[in-house]
C-alpha cells in the first residue's frame, strides 16, 4: 500500500529545535551582577557629565581668549551692536501709543550715548572732563574798585589762532614780563611758568623747546665768559698803571755833608 501524502509531509518536516536550557543560578550568585551593571551605568553618566562640563569650560576659556585677542576696534563694534540690539528691544517693549516725536527723541538720545561711549573707548587715556576748547574766564578786577573788571579771556588778543596772532600775543606779553627779570624771584617764577606752558604739549614738542633753551643757555655762557675775560684784562691794565703812577720820581737833593759834625769830633 502506497504511503499517504500526509506521511510524506510528516517525514519531510524539519526536526524541532532543541530546547533552550536556562542557566542555573548558583547559590553564590545573587543580585550583585545586576547592581554592578547599574553602578557601571551611573558611572558612565557621571563621566559624561564631567566631560560635558569640561568641554563647556574649555569652550568658555577659548571664547574669553578669543575676546582678549580682538582688537579695540572689534570690541567697540561689538559693543555698538549690543547697544543697537538693546535699543531695538527697548523700542519693541515701548507702548505702541508712543508718538513719533518722542520715539525720535529717544533714538537720538540713545545714539548720542552710544557715540559718547564710543569716544571714551577710543580715547580712554584722555581725561574727557577737561574741556580744552573752552578756556576759563580770566577776570581781572581793580582792588580799589571791584566793579571795574576785565575778562581777559574774552579779548581777541588772548584768543589767537594764526601765526601772526600768536606773534602779536608774544610781543605784548614779553615786555610786560621781562620788565621784572632783575627781581629775586623772577628765575624761579620763569621755571614754573615754562613748565605750565608746555604741560599740555606732547613729548616731541617739549623736546624741541628744551633744545631751544639749551641753545640759549650755551650762547649765554659764551657771552659771560667773554665778558669775564674782558673784565680781567681791564683790571690788569688798571693795576699796572696805578703801580707805575704811585712810584716817587723825585730826586733826593738833600746835602748830607752838613750834618753838624766837625772832623775834630772824632779826634
UniProtKB/Swiss-Prot annotation:
Alphabetical list of Pfam families matching this protein: eIF3_subunit
Subunit structure as annotated in this protein's UniProt entry: Component of the eukaryotic translation initiation factor 3 (eIF-3) complex.
UniProt GO cellular component terms: eukaryotic 43S preinitiation complex; eukaryotic 48S preinitiation complex; eukaryotic translation initiation factor 3 complex
Extent of Acidic residues compositional bias: 28-46, 90-100
A single GO molecular function term of this UniProt record: translation initiation factor activity
Stretches that traverse the bilayer: none
Ranges where the record places region Disordered: 1-118, 221-241
Subcellular localization(s) per the UniProt record: Cytoplasm
Family per similarity comment: Belongs to the eIF-3 subunit J family.
One of the GO BP terms on file: formation of cytoplasmic translation initiation complex
Classification lineage: Eukaryota, Fungi, Dikarya, Ascomycota, Pezizomycotina
Primary gene name: hcr1
Superkingdom in the source lineage: Eukaryota
Positions in coiled-coil regions: 44-99
InterPro entries: eIF3-like_dom_sf, eIF3j
Range of residues in the leader sequence: none
Name this polypeptide is given: Eukaryotic translation initiation factor 3 subunit J
Keyword tags: Coiled coil, Cytoplasm, Initiation factor, Protein biosynthesis
Amino acid at each position: 500500500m502506497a504511503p499517504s501524502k500526509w506521511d510524506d509531509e510528516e517525514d519531510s518536516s524539519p526536526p524541532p529545535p532543541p530546547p533552550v536550557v536556562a542557566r542555573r543560578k548558583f547559590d553564590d550568585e545573587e543580585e550583585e551582577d545586576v547592581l554592578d551593571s547599574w553602578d557601571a551605568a551611573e558611572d558612565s553618566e557621571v563621566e559624561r557629565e564631567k566631560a560635558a562640563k569640561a568641554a563647556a569650560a574649555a569652550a568658555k576659556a577659548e571664547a574669553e581668549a578669543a575676546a582678549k585677542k580682538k582688537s579695540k576696534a572689534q570690541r567697540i563694534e561689538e559693543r555698538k551692536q549690543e547697544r543697537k540690539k538693546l535699543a531695538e528691544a527697548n523700542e519693541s517693549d515701548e507702548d505702541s501709543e508712543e508718538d513719533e516725536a518722542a520715539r525720535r527723541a529717544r533714538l537720538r538720545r540713545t545714539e548720542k550715548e552710544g557715540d559718547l561711549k564710543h569716544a571714551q573707548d577710543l580715547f580712554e587715556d584722555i581725561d574727557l572732563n577737561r574741556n580744552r576748547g573752552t578756556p576759563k574766564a580770566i577776570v581781572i578786577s581793580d582792588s580799589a574798585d571791584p566793579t571795574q573788571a576785565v575778562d581777559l579771556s574774552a579779548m581777541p588778543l588772548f584768543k589767537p589762532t594764526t601765526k601772526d596772532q600768536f606773534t602779536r600775543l608774544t610781543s605784548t606779553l614779553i615786555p610786560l614780563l621781562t620788565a621784572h627779570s632783575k627781581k629775586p624771584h623772577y628765575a624761579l617764577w620763569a621755571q614754573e611758568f615754562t613748565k605750565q606752558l608746555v604741560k599740555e604739549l606732547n613729548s616731541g614738542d617739549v623736546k624741541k623747546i628744551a633744545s631751544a633753551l639749551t641753545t640759549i643757555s650755551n650762547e649765554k655762557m659764551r657771552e659771560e665768559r667773554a665778558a669775564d675775560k674782558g673784565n680781567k684784562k681791564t683790571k690788569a691794565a688798571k693795576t699796572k698803571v696805578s703801580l707805575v703812577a704811585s712810584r716817587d720820581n723825585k730826586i733826593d737833593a738833600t746835602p748830607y755833608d752838613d750834618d753838624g759834625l766837625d772832623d775834630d769830633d772824632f779826634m
